[in-house]
């Protein structure tokens, strides 16, 4: 009887540990040292990693989640210990019922069934608690007189497992500039973070590209693991600023469909990264989305973007984008036959107070004039 109680307690403890490990905030994490947590492996790869990673650079994104990570990472092997138990013993449920096991096996079978049930439920409900980065393609670009490798990374954040990840495309010099700027500002935290060295030769071989791809994934993951670095303006700029500039350029030249995809990607990046610097970039992104949706004859989506922007603005009556968003919301609501009285009254109050001209500048005008830096 005492033995059965011990096994039941062990099953309960292990199930509790698994539940917290999958959620990403349990005692298993707390027990690990901060350094091991943040920097599980070096960014400089061993030779035998190149072949495995090369197979991942096929352009097809392989989704992983916090509870099902089988990317052949070294840290997985290191973390595996005596507490890991198989989910079954190779015996089917029917055979187990026909041949009752000895008393000593009841605890392990009960644990296996509990783990299997929890596994099935959690696969569809749990999402990664941190941003994950995966190089999905690496292409050699020849732009005479220069030649470089363009790395495309998927940025996978918390959310539904089937959510399409945001993407960025950067070259080695972009990563190097980010590393140099952060080193200058954060000497202490950056001292523990490795970065792939520059090479004079063999920069375009499959092996070098594979090594750097893996190193860039780890480099960004390490930066995200340190709060002081995660919120650094240079890191925010690295992810978002090139997307915003390209989207703005396409919008100004009338390529609205192409611009819309970039604005949407920039919005998703900002939602995943957070915006500690303030709402200006998200507001500019919503302005770009609203303009493109409107030009592509989708007033419903354009109005939804305006509503989201007005929620972000709150009662900031002096913000230069408030009146343009109100004016666009009034016009789109009238077009769709929806209530526009609140926005209309608010816009009129701004005009009577002399806080905005009549009529206010359009979102498109402000978007064209905005200098992104």
Curated annotation (Swiss-Prot):
Biased composition (Polar residues): 55-65
Domain PX, first and last residues per copy: 129-246
GO molecular function annotations of the record: phosphatidylinositol phosphate binding; phosphatidylinositol-3-phosphate binding; phosphatidylinositol-4,5-bisphosphate binding
Gene Ontology annotations of biological process type: protein transport
Biased composition range(s): Acidic residues: 66-81
Compartments (UniProt record): Cytoplasmic vesicle membrane; Early endosome membrane
Tissues in which the UniProt entry reports expression: Highly expressed in fetus liver, but only weakly expressed in brain, skeleton muscle, smooth muscle, and cardiac muscle, kidney, and adrenal gland.
PANTHER family in the cross-refs: SORTING NEXIN 20, 21, SORTING NEXIN-21
The protein's name in its UniProt record: Sorting nexin-21
Gene: SNX21
């Amino acid at each position: 009887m005492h033995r059965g109680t011990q096994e039941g307690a062990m099953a309960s403890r292990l199930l509790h540990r698994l539940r917290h490990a999958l959620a990403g905030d349990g005692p298993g994490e707390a027990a690990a040292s901060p350094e091991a947590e943040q920097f599980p492996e070096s960014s400089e790869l061993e030779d035998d990693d190149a072949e495995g990673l090369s197979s991942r650079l096929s352009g097809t994104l392989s989704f992983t989640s916090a509870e099902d990570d089988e990317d052949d990472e070294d840290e997985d092997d290191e973390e595996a210990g005596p507490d890991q138990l198989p989910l079954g013993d190779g015996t089917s449920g029917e055979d187990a019922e026909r041949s009752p096991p000895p008393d000593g096996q009841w605890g392990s079978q009960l644990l296996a069934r509990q783990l299997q049930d929890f596994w099935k439920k959690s696969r569809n409900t749990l999402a990664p608690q941190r941003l994950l980065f995966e190089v999905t393609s690496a292409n050699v670009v020849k732009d005479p007189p220069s030649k470089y490798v363009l790395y495309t990374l998927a940025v996978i954040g918390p959310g539904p497992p089937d959510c399409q990840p945001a993407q960025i495309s950067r070259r080695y010099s972009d990563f190097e500039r980010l590393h140099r700027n952060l080193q200058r500002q954060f000497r202490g935290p950056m001292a523990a973070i490795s970065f792939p060295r520059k090479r004079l030769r063999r920069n375009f071989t499959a092996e070098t590209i594979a090594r750097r791809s893996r190193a860039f994934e780890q480099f960004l993951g390490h930066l995200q693991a340190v709060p002081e670095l995660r919120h650094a303006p240079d890191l925010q700029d690295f992810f978002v600023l090139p997307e915003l500039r390209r989207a703005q350029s396409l919008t100004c030249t009338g390529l609205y469909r192409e611009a819309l995809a970039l604005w949407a990607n920039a919005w998703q990046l900002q939602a995943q990264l957070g915006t500690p610097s303030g709402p200006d970039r998200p507001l500019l992104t919503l302005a770009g989305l609203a303009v493109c949706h409107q030009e592509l004859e989708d007033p419903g989506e354009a109005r939804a973007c305006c509503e989201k922007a007005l929620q972000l603005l709150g009662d900031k009556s002096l913000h230069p984008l408030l009146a343009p968003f109100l004016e666009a919301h009034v016009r789109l609501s009238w077009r769709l036959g929806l209530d526009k009285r609140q926005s209309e009254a608010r816009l009129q109050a701004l005009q009577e107070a002399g806080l905005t001209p009549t009529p206010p500048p359009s979102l498109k005008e402000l978007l064209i004039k905005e200098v992104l830096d």
